[in-house]
Regions:
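Flexible, small-/acidic-enriched active-site or ligand-binding loops
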Residues: 290
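Glycine-rich beta-alpha junction loops
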Residues: 33, 105-108, 176-181, 211-213, ...
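Internal, well-ordered alpha-helical segments in soluble enzyme and binding-protein domains
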Residues: 118, 149-156, 168, 172, ...
Length: 290
C-alpha cells in the first residue's frame, strides 16, 4: 500500500508514521527546503520521518510531478487549510476514484471556522479540553496526535475496508477541534465523581517520593486501593477512598510516599495488583520499552 503524505508538521507526520508501522510504503512530498518541522522541531522530525521516502517539489510552480505519484497512491494525506490543496492542483478531485484522500483540518469543512488558523493548543481550548487545567499546558500535543493523527488513521483504515467492498475510495475529513471535544464530551453529562481522572480523587494522582522522583498512583478500583493501603501499613485508609474530603486523603498519601525513595516503592509494589508505577524519564522509558 502506498501512502503519499503532503502534510506539514505533526498531525500528518504522526499519522503516516502509524501507517508505516502497519506496513505501508510512505512517500512524503515536501516543499523546497523540506518540511518546516525539520527546523522547528528536529527531534520530532527525526522520529516521525524515519523509514519514509522524501521528495521535494514546488507544488505552486508545477503540481504534475506530484500528481504522477498521487495517481499511484492508495492513500493521500494532507493538512493544508481547506481549499489550498485544490488550488495547488492536488485536491481530492485530482486523484483517481479508488484513492482514499484524507484531509486533517483544524475545524472541519464548511463551518464558520473552516478558515481559522490554529495549532494544537488552540484546538484544545476551543474543544473545552483545557477548561479546568488552564493555564497548564499538556505535555504532548493531544489534539495533533489523538484527535488529528489517530483520528486520521482510523478513518483511513475504515475507508480502505469500504474500498475493498465497493472499489471506490473516499474523501475523509478530520477535525482536530471536534475530535478533541469527543475526548471530553463525557463531561457534558457530569462525572459521578468530579474530575475523577484529572486530580479529583486522591487515588488517581502523582505523588513525590523521598528522592524527589514521582509515582503514578491510580488504584481506582476499591480492591486495588485496599491492597495498596495494606502494603503501606495504613489499611484504615481504604474506607476513605471516596470520602468527600479528597484533599485530606491526598495529604495522608503524600506523607506516606514521601518517606521512601522511588526504587523502594517500585520494589514493594512490583508483584502486586495496585496500579502504581514510576514517572519514568524519557531515557528510562526507552530502555524499559525496548
Amino acid at each position: 500500500m502506498l501512502v503519499v503524505d503532503l502534510s506539514r508538521y505533526l498531525p500528518g507526520a504522526f499519522a503516516s508514521r502509524e501507517l508505516l508501522e502497519l506496513g505501508a510504503r510512505v512517500a512524503c512530498i515536501e516543499p523546497p527546503g523540506g518540511d518546516p518541522l525539520r527546523s522547528t522541531a528536529p527531534a520530532w522530525d527525526a522520529a516521525l520521518r524515519a523509514g519514509k521516502e522524501s521528495l521535494e517539489l514546488d507544488l505552486k510552480c508545477d503540481p504534475e510531478p506530484a500528481l504522477d505519484l498521487l495517481r499511484e497512491a492508495d492513500v493521500v494525506l494532507e493538512s493544508f487549510r481547506p481549499g489550498v490543496a485544490s488550488r495547488l492542483g492536488v485536491g481530492p478531485e485530482h486523484v483517481p476514484e479508488r484513492t482514499v484522500y484524507c484531509s486533517i483540518t483544524g475545524f472541519g469543512l464548511g463551518g464558520r471556522d473552516e478558515q481559522r488558523a490554529g495549532h494544537d493548543l488552540n484546538y484544545l481550548g476551543w474543544a473545552g479540553a483545557l477548561w479546568d487545567t488552564a493555564p497548564a499546558l499538556p505535555p504532548v500535543p493531544i489534539a495533533d496526535f489523538a484527535a488529528g493523527a489517530l483520528g486520521a488513521v482510523t478513518k483511513i483504515l475504515a475507508a480502505l475496508l469500504e474500498r475493498d467492498r465497493t472499489g471506490r475510495g473516499a474523501h475523509v475529513v478530520v477535525s482536530m477541534t471536534h475530535g478533541s471535544h469527543r475526548l471530553v464530551a463525557h463531561r457534558l453529562g457530569g462525572d459521578t465523581v468530579p474530575r475523577m481522572l484529572t486530580g479529583g480523587l486522591a487515588s488517581y494522582r502523582i505523588y513525590q517520593t523521598a528522592d524527589g522522583r514521582h509515582l503514578t498512583v491510580a488504584p481506582l478500583e476499591p480492591v486495588f486501593f485496599r491492597r495498596l493501603t495494606e502494603l503501606v501499613g495504613r489499611p484504615e485508609l481504604a474506607e476513605r477512598q471516596f470520602d468527600a474530603d479528597q484533599e485530606a486523603l491526598a495529604a495522608e498519601l503524600a506523607s506516606i510516599f514521601a518517606k521512601r525513595p522511588l526504587a523502594d516503592w517500585l520494589e514493594l509494589f512490583d508483584s502486586e495488583d495496585v496500579c502504581v508505577g514510576p514517572v519514568a524519564t524519557i531515557a528510562e522509558a526507552a530502555t524499559d520499552l525496548a
